[in-house]
Amino acid sequence: MAMTVHVDIVSAEEQIFSGLAEFVALPGEAGELGILPGHMPLMTRIKPGAVRVKRPDQAEEELVFVAGGILEVQPGLVTVLADTAIRGKDLDEAKALEAKRIAEEALKNQSTEIDYAKAQAELAEAIAQIAAIQKLRKRGH
């Protein structure tokens, strides 16, 4: 049997995933992070993007989109506290493309620094959702 670590992915609304995993990959603040069983304790912010979870009983990785949040790694436990989390199968490409278009339009028409920062964050989230959808499409879902 492969070594595993318990993974919890939660948002403010609900628990998205809870189970054993052989591997977890996610977008950390300084780049892509890969977590294997036995990883050193760690706490870091995560950026919008796809969290990939390799379960021991499945060939396909589970994909969860997160809009940022916090990652905590402890011995035997990986916890993702996401601002927003959406299961890969629940992502809506048309909605993400529309959010991207609106954010790009807001960037062109911003009136204050706050508007600009908000539009940038919304654009980054929409782009990350689209990238997650494209990963799913490549896998044939």
Curated annotation (Swiss-Prot):
CDD domains in UniProt: F1-ATPase_delta
Cited function: Produces ATP from ADP in the presence of a proton gradient across the membrane.
Membrane topology: Peripheral membrane protein
Keywords for the protein's UniProt record, in alphabetical order: ATP synthesis, Cell inner membrane, Cell membrane, CF(1), Hydrogen ion transport, Ion transport, Membrane, Transport
Cell location: Cell inner membrane
Matches recorded under InterPro entries: ATP_F1_dsu/esu_C_sf (IPR036794), ATP_synth_F1_dsu/esu (IPR001469), ATP_synth_F1_dsu/esu_N (IPR020546), ATP_synth_F1_esu_C (IPR020547), ATPsynth_dsu/esu_N (IPR036771)
Presence of the UniProt keyword Transport in the record: yes
GO molecular function: ATP binding; proton-transporting ATP synthase activity, rotational mechanism
Family: Belongs to the ATPase epsilon chain family.
The UniProt record lists the keyword Ion transport: yes
GO cellular component, one term: plasma membrane
Protein source organism: Aromatoleum aromaticum (strain DSM 19018 / LMG 30748 / EbN1)
Designated name of the protein: ATP synthase epsilon chain
Binding partners and assembly: F-type ATPases have 2 components, CF(1) - the catalytic core - and CF(0) - the membrane proton channel. CF(1) has five subunits: alpha(3), beta(3), gamma(1), delta(1), epsilon(1). CF(0) has three main subunits: a, b and c.
Family annotation (SUPFAM superfamilies): Epsilon subunit of F1F0-ATP synthase C-terminal domain, Epsilon subunit of F1F0-ATP synthase N-terminal domain
